[in-house]
Amino acid sequence: MRTKSLKKNKINVITLGCSKNVYDSEVLMGQLRANGKEVTHEATAKDEGNIIVINTCGFIDNAKAESVNMILEYADKKDKGLVDKVFVTGCLSERYRPDLEKEIPNVDQYFGTTELPQLLKALGADYKHELLGERLTTTPKNYAYLKIAEGCDRPCSFCAIPLMRGSHVSQPIEKLVKEAQGLAKNGVKELILIAQDLTYYGLDLYKKRNLAELLEALAAVEGIEWIRLHYAYPTGFPMDVLELMKREPKICNYIDIPLQHISDSILKSMRRGTTQAKTTQLLKDFRAAVPGMAIRTTLIVGYPGETQEDFEILKEFVQEMKFDRMGCFAYSHEENTHAYLLEDDVPDDVKQARANEIMELQSQISWDLNQEKVGQVFRCIIDRKEGAHFVGRTEFDSPDVDNEVLIDASKHYVKTGEFVNIKIIEATEFDLYGEPA
């Protein structure tokens, strides 16, 4: 007599949004694996799993739309019997759970950003405290994100992050060092430190800004060769970090410091706690303290009340400062933020035109800066082979958002996951082409 075999569940974790969501998904998958669950993050047509977890983003309109569309897609697949269960977590779920439960009720359950144990229980797993940050990384083997804090205490008028992530909570240095040691044992060479605000690190735990002390502890971890800083805040920046960056070779001469705008009237309305003069001086201090450092920033155009004069001030600032890397976004009018009380008075087409103009300006700046690199030799980490090229990065470039170094695979072989000295032979606005030196 033949018996029907029981289908083994396979859980597919789909991640939308920022690197902090990537980290959260990796923690979730690590917990699931420790519970003996089969888990994947590869959504393929042949085998995408029968239980779906969607880790959503709820930051701005485009991200929210992408998350909603993904939920609808898998809710429809569930209705058609193509998947068995659908669970939703992350920022969109945290922010809009009642609305989502009403509008898309065929999702099995919604969870917020702090409900990992509850999500695991719904997936038939137990939360294991002893894992201490162990996770199933989804990035190339040579780098990993390290989330040093959660939430944010800044009062920025346009930002909904505190609504979804709560107040700032730093992770203890000893916990982060242990996590870094585990990553290094698994082959990670580059740590990318992330938080809503790196510069606030330690104020809650240690009653002082403690980022430099954390960096020193992480730099002592054997196997870690690069440490990269993302998402610093211009107000209250701990300058001892720059002193450490200059003398500690493991800390990349790179910082991501979203400035958002530079016009004093817009900065005041945004509640950024700084001015054009203070910001300009801070950036000059950065470059004086660490000559050659790469500065990445993010700007917002079309904020309520932004005049053509405000925009011209911003353009002049971009031209003057010549940022190494930049992103620019059209303002998104977010419910329950302070700025939502203001009239969203800049037309969408004007917002987008201004964003395009800023990025065109930055493209020329990037072209000029990259041409200066031709003929120079840089130590690069090789992330992957893609098509006809090996793809790497210098210490001045972060994954996914910055320049890449492309090496012709038909002419040269370099080992992925390793450091190689590369001579730059050609450059475009956002890519460098090189060969082993």
Curated annotation (Swiss-Prot):
<dbReference type="InterPro" id="IPR007197">
    <property type="entry name" value="rSAM"/>
</dbReference>
<dbReference type="InterPro" id="IPR023404">
    <property type="entry name" value="rSAM_horseshoe"/>
</dbReference>
<comment type="similarity">
    <text>Belongs to the methylthiotransferase family. RimO subfamily.</text>
</comment>
<dbReference type="Pfam" id="PF00919">
    <property type="entry name" value="UPF0004"/>
</dbReference>
<dbReference type="Pfam" id="PF18693">
    <property type="entry name" value="TRAM_2"/>
</dbReference>
<dbReference type="InterPro" id="IPR020612">
    <property type="entry name" value="Methylthiotransferase_CS"/>
</dbReference>
<dbReference type="InterPro" id="IPR013848">
    <property type="entry name" value="Methylthiotransferase_N"/>
</dbReference>
<feature type="domain" description="TRAM">
    <location>
        <begin position="371"/>
        <end position="437"/>
    </location>
</feature>
<keyword id="KW-0411">Iron-sulfur</keyword>
<keyword id="KW-0408">Iron</keyword>
<dbReference type="GO" id="GO:0005829">
    <property type="term" value="C:cytosol"/>
</dbReference>
<feature type="domain" description="Radical SAM core">
    <location>
        <begin position="138"/>
        <end position="368"/>
    </location>
</feature>
<dbReference type="InterPro" id="IPR012340">
    <property type="entry name" value="NA-bd_OB-fold"/>
</dbReference>
<keyword id="KW-0808">Transferase</keyword>
<feature type="binding site">
    <location>
        <position position="156"/>
    </location>
    <ligand>
        <name>[4Fe-4S] cluster 2</name>
    </ligand>
</feature>
<keyword id="KW-0949">S-adenosyl-L-methionine</keyword>
<feature type="binding site">
    <location>
        <position position="57"/>
    </location>
    <ligand>
        <name>[4Fe-4S] cluster 1</name>
    </ligand>
</feature>
<keyword id="KW-0963">Cytoplasm</keyword>
<keyword id="KW-0479">Metal-binding</keyword>
<dbReference type="GO" id="GO:0051539">
    <property type="term" value="F:4 iron, 4 sulfur cluster binding"/>
</dbReference>
<dbReference type="GO" id="GO:0035599">
    <property type="term" value="F:aspartic acid methylthiotransferase activity"/>
</dbReference>
<keyword id="KW-0004">4Fe-4S</keyword>
<dbReference type="InterPro" id="IPR006638">
    <property type="entry name" value="Elp3/MiaA/NifB-like_rSAM"/>
</dbReference>
<feature type="binding site">
    <location>
        <position position="18"/>
    </location>
    <ligand>
        <name>[4Fe-4S] cluster 1</name>
    </ligand>
</feature>
<feature type="domain" description="MTTase N-terminal">
    <location>
        <begin position="9"/>
        <end position="128"/>
    </location>
</feature>
<feature type="binding site">
    <location>
        <position position="91"/>
    </location>
    <ligand>
        <name>[4Fe-4S] cluster 1</name>
    </ligand>
</feature>
<dbReference type="InterPro" id="IPR002792">
    <property type="entry name" value="TRAM_dom"/>
</dbReference>
<dbReference type="InterPro" id="IPR038135">
    <property type="entry name" value="Methylthiotransferase_N_sf"/>
</dbReference>
<feature type="binding site">
    <location>
        <position position="159"/>
    </location>
    <ligand>
        <name>[4Fe-4S] cluster 2</name>
    </ligand>
</feature>
<dbReference type="InterPro" id="IPR005840">
    <property type="entry name" value="Ribosomal_uS12_MeSTrfase_RimO"/>
</dbReference>
<dbReference type="GO" id="GO:0103039">
    <property type="term" value="F:protein methylthiotransferase activity"/>
</dbReference>
<dbReference type="Pfam" id="PF04055">
    <property type="entry name" value="Radical_SAM"/>
</dbReference>
<dbReference type="InterPro" id="IPR005839">
    <property type="entry name" value="Methylthiotransferase"/>
</dbReference>
<comment type="function">
    <text>Catalyzes the methylthiolation of an aspartic acid residue of ribosomal protein uS12.</text>
</comment>
<dbReference type="GO" id="GO:0046872">
    <property type="term" value="F:metal ion binding"/>
</dbReference>
<protein>
    <recommendedName>
        <fullName>Ribosomal protein uS12 methylthiotransferase RimO</fullName>
        <ecNumber>2.8.4.4</ecNumber>
    </recommendedName>
</protein>
<feature type="binding site">
    <location>
        <position position="152"/>
    </location>
    <ligand>
        <name>[4Fe-4S] cluster 2</name>
    </ligand>
</feature>
<dbReference type="GO" id="GO:0006400">
    <property type="term" value="P:tRNA modification"/>
</dbReference>
